[in-house]
């Protein structure tokens, strides 16, 4: 018989049944031992009452309770004795957040907010409290501007009782409003689910969407003109139901963490071109939808967003990576507000000019009264096309406080539309800034152009010459006022003052100066419509001086997601200012991006067979390691080559959707730090029932579980400090899980 003292942190076994009578609830105020059972449940004992655990041939005895071959892991936790340690807290735009250290033996925290519209502490939604493995984080959104906010973090015991004696409060925080300026807000419109003061509109519904519930989230909605309702399942289907136009209830869709195309069923996304789509029956279908990211890591990976028809839509605080076709496109949409978005590289298209993806933000099909503000474009190729050939009206679009960060062209390229471009930061643009084509009317005001080639161009005149930077050779008109041009920007710009015919822009001396009709585009003879001096057509706004734009746009409240997002990059101005090539290092970072989010606090999916709570997917080295490959390795021990495939197995009551495809390119590489018995769990969706290990095909047998749809190979001994490369065996396979059990020393 072996005796295990309380000095051990963790060990694990597998087996069958348990008999327990004297276990207690989890209590963070006491020193406890936790037995994690193979059915996923846990038993807790106070160490003051259980002085010794004994192990005898698979049977564990804790005091008077006996467990027969069914303990998957053992962990010990000391009683907490200090208050929650808050590591960071800040107020932002209509939101605030707090970060805090995690206790080993606390799985849930309640978080409260006070200030602004809350006179007393009010508990925030539990979905806003998340686990990042090494720390916890809570974000509060929908806040009024105010200087008196505080957040309070309270640990919750195993019996769901708050441990208020260990609660901590933040310092006083300031919250500011989003800037609601631009054509989207004309005639007192308030796009989205929020009021102008930042709080939710009356009766608004809130949906919290993660990669786990993207396909399963449900909402009851009005389906016809009689008021009948129906429950719709999945975010894409909920958006489709909005198209009918019968349910105009404001809806705030809050995105938590990263969502990839692998997380989305085909029914929830449209084509590669459209990605996730919100569509109205007509351009005046009232949507009242805000699609917003929570915190600084909300990301769509592999798809973009299309707004098709409809009015009153908003998208904010989300990152877009590896999207197909356009990152965001608007087609026939009115009163749309797209702001604080991080645009990274899309997937390469078939055309030569689509190596960084197609458009990042494109506006088409007679969209009008739209505002694009405080967005960050990271080396985008074709940044923003504004207008096609079909528009016949002015449309009225505004771009303000965007950070064009070493992007290439189309900032924006405007066809036919009337556009106000103000207070944007052109930071090392390599090809073309603002482009006027096909009768466009553009007012370019108080922007900062740092070493940007061709800051303003009119097709087939001025700096553009007769080459035509666009397919549409007709020109348009640009009025410029109050801009700062430095470096290359200043040397390539042609003002009408020096070039009265072959100019790049009419450079006004005052903001209210009208462009005379005698100034026309060389090709097409278009005159400027002077919309910016017509009070009935313009909105109220307050631009800062162009010299102040870089600090504002790159500051804490500036462009992009909160805290500038969880994926950031610093460009080398010496080389990147003039290059329109893909930045290989940035591309690798974008392709390899994954959030560090574990999950909503207390609802995390367990993907390992042991380990301390709050420690992520990889358990302590003494325990069993159960590594999943549900779109990425759950343990940092493993490196995957090739691609992932659908498997959909259920193993030990936990469902897994994806595994590593063991085809000609598939591989898993790892180097264990100790000796293990390795078990491979293969999905029966593929024919493979063996693999090659370092080039040699396995010969062990296994057992097929038809109900769980997996094949469990027999154990294979592997040795510490040895590199193992697993590849395809006799047939194409699908590796769903790898289980490593320590060899007893």
How should each PLM-predicted stretch be described?
Residues 86-106:
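Conserved aromatic anchor
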Residues 423, 430, 434-606:
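Extracellular beta-rich repeat passengers
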Residues 229-248, 264-290, 299-316, 321-333, ...:
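Extracellular beta-strand-rich solenoid/capping regions of secreted or surface-exposed proteins
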Residues 287-297, 311-322, 334-349, 359-360, ...:
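Right-handed parallel beta-helix
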Residues 686-698:
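Short, surface-exposed beta-strand/strand-loop-strand elements in extracellular ectodomains
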Residues 268-279, 301-304, 322-329, 350-364, ...:
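Extracellular beta-strand/beta-solenoid scaffold signature
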Residues 140-161:
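Beta-strand-rich modules
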Residues 651-674, 685-688, 710-714, 732-737:
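Short beta-strands within extracellular/lumenal beta-sheet-rich domains
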């Amino acid at each position: 018989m072996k005796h295990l003292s309380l000095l051990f942190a963790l060990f694990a076994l597998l087996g069958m049944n348990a008999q327990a009578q004297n276990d207690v609830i989890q209590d963070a105020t006491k020193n406890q031992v936790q037995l994690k059972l193979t059915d996923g449940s846990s038993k807790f004992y106070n160490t003051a009452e259980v002085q010794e655990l004994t192990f005898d041939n698979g049977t564990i005895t804790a005091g008077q309770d006996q467990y027969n071959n069914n303990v998957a892991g053992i962990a010990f936790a000391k009683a907490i004795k200090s208050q929650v340690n808050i590591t960071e807290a800040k107020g932002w735009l209509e939101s605030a957040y707090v970060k805090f250290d995690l206790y080993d033996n606390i799985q849930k925290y309640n978080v409260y907010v006070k200030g602004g519209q809350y006179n007393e502490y009010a508990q925030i939604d539990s979905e806003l409290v998340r686990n990042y493995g090494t720390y916890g984080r809570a974000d509060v959104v929908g806040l009024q501007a105010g200087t008196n906010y505080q957040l309070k973090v309270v640990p919750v015991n195993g019996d769901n009782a708050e441990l208020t004696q260990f609660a901590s409060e933040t310092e006083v925080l300031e919250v500011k409003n989003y800037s609601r300026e631009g054509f989207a807000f004309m005639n007192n419109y308030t796009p989205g689910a929020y009021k102008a003061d930042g709080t939710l509109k009356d009766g608004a519904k809130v949906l919290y969407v993660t990669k786990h519930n993207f396909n399963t989230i449900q909402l009851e909605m009005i389906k016809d003109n009689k008021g009948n309702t129906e429950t719709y399942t999945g975010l894409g289907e909920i958006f489709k139901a909005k198209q009918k136009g019968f349910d105009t209830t404001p809806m705030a869709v809050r995105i938590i963490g990263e969502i990839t195309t692998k997380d989305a069923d085909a029914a929830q996304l449209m084509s590669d071109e459209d990605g996730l789509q919100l569509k109205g029956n007509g351009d005046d279908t009232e949507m009242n939808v805000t699609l917003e990211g929570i915190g600084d890591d909300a990301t769509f990976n592999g798809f973009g967003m299309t707004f098709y028809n409809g009015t009153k839509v908003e998208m904010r605080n989300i990152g877009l990576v590896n999207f197909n076709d356009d990152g965001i496109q608007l087609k026939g949409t009115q009163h749309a507000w797209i702001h604080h978005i991080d645009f990274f590289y899309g997937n390469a298209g078939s055309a030569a000019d689509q190596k960084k993806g197609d458009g990042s933000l494109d506006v088409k099909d007679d969209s009008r009264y739209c505002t694009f503000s405080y967005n960050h474009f990271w080396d985008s190729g074709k940044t923003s096309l504004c207008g096609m050939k079909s528009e016949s009206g002015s449309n009225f679009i505004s771009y303000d406080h965007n950070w064009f960060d070493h992007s290439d062209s189309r900032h924006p390229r405007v066809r036919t539309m009337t556009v106000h471009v103000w207070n944007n930061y052109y930071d090392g643009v390599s090809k073309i800034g603002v482009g006027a084509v096909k009768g466009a009317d553009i007012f370019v005001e108080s922007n900062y152009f740092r070493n940007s080639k061709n800051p303003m161009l009119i097709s087939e005149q001025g700096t553009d010459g007769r080459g035509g930077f666009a397919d549409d050779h007709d020109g348009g008109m640009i009025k410029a006022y109050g801009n700062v041009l430095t470096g290359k920007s200043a040397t390539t710009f042609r003002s009408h003052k020096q070039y009265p015919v072959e100019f790049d822009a009419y450079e006004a001396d005052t903001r209210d100066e009208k462009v005379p009709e005698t100034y026309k585009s060389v090709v097409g003879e278009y005159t400027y419509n002077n919309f910016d001096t017509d009070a009935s057509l313009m909105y109220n706004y307050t631009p800062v001086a162009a010299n102040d734009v870089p600090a504002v746009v790159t500051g804490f409240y500036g462009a992009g997601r909160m805290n500038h997002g969880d994926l950031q990059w610093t460009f080398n101005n010496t080389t990147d200012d003039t290059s329109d090539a893909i930045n290989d290092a940035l591309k690798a970072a974008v392709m390899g991006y994954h959030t560090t989010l574990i999950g909503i606090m207390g609802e995390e999916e367990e993907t390992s067979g042991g380990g301390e709570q709050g420690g992520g997917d990889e358990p302590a080295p003494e325990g069993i390691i159960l590594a999943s490959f549900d779109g990425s390795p759950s343990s940092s021990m493993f490196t995957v080559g090739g691609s992932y495939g659908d498997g959909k197995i259920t193993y030990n009551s936990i469902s897994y959707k994806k595994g590593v495809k063991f085809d000609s390119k598939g591989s898993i590489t790892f180097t264990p730090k100790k000796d293990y018995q390795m078990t491979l769990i293969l999905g029966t969706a593929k024919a493979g029932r063996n693999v090659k290990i370092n080039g040699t095909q396995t010969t062990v047998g296994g057992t097929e579980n038809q109900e769980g749809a997996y094949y469990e190979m027999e154990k294979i001994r592997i040795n510490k400090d040895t590199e193992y490369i697993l590849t395809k065996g006799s047939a194409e396979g699908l590796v769903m899980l790898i289980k490593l059990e320590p060899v007893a020393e």
